[in-house]
A protein has these predicted regions:
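NAD(P)-dependent short-chain dehydrogenase/reductase
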Residues: 123-171, 175-183
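Catalytic helix-loop patch of NAD(P)-dependent Rossmann-fold dehydrogenases
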Residues: 65, 70-73, 84, 93-135, ...
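Mid/C-terminal beta-alpha module of Rossmann-like enzyme folds, strongest
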Residues: 180, 187-202
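Rossmann-fold cofactor-recognition segment
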Residues: 15-30
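NAD(P)H-binding glycine-rich loop region in Rossmannoid oxidoreductase-like domains
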Residues: 26-66
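NAD(P)-cofactor binding segment of oxidoreductase domains
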Residues: 44, 58-86
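N-terminal Rossmann NAD(P)H-binding glycine-rich loop of SDR-like oxidoreductase domains
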Residues: 1-6
Length: 202
């Protein structure tokens, strides 16, 4: 977001290519260490993940490399240069069978490969990063691909659209999550945070 342009320098992103953008395979510890040692960032924000829930079931090894080993590598590198690590996680670290919201003090109980690999990533961050923020978010949406845009597109080509109606959650704006990250990284309030917008829908 442009409002942060004055005090934040973006080094890496997984959504853009071109001049001034450096790509990084977070599953490659040597590549991660090389770049982080060269750049010496104050803060590393990890938004990378294999988020295709069904795909994670079919590609466990890849999901584990990206969702668990990647965060581990970033945590090791962050500690090496004294950087803070912001790790974006998910509500899928919980089974999702309860009707009431979960807190940061509840014990994770993932049932999907996605949730299990994301939880392992969290555990690696807690083990290897000295200064970390783990933000569990849910139903994230932004200007890119999102559920609402998908449904509008599908509705234009289908007379009837079927979706699940027994799931409840709090749709969370990517902009609001970015504001939360920006706020937290300026503090020393390390730990696990549940970061979603208010409200509930299904």
């Amino acid at each position: 977001q442009k409002e942060y342009a004055g005090d934040v320098t973006f080094i890496l992103t997984d959504v853009a290519e071109g001049e001034g953008i450096t790509s990084l395979d977070i599953t490659d510890i040597d590549a991660v260490m090389s770049l982080v040692l060269a750049q010496k960032p104050d803060v590393i924000i990890n938004c990378a993940a294999l988020t295709n829930v069904d795909g994670c079931e079919k590609m466990w090894d890849l999901a584990y490399k990206i969702n668990a080993i990647g965060p581990r590598n970033l945590a090791i590198a962050a500690t090496a240069v004294g950087a803070k690590l912001v790790h974006v996680s998910t509500d899928y670290v919980f089974a999702g069978t309860e009707r009431t919201p979960r807190t940061e003090f509840d014990t994770p109980d993932p049932i999907s490969a996605y949730g299990k690999t994301k939880l392992e990533g969290e555990q690696f961050v807690r083990q290897f990063a000295e200064k970390f923020f783990i933000l569990r978010t849910a139903w994230l949406y932004g200007d890119g691909k999102n559920f609402v845009k998908t449904m509008v597109r599908v509705a234009k080509t289908h007379d009837e659209v079927s979706v699940v109606c027994d799931q409840f959650g709090s749709p969370t704006s990517a902009v609001e999550l970015a504001k939360m990250i920006h706020f937290l990284e300026g503090t020393d309030n390390y730990g696990i945070f549940h970061a979603t917008c208010e409200g509930e829908t299904n």
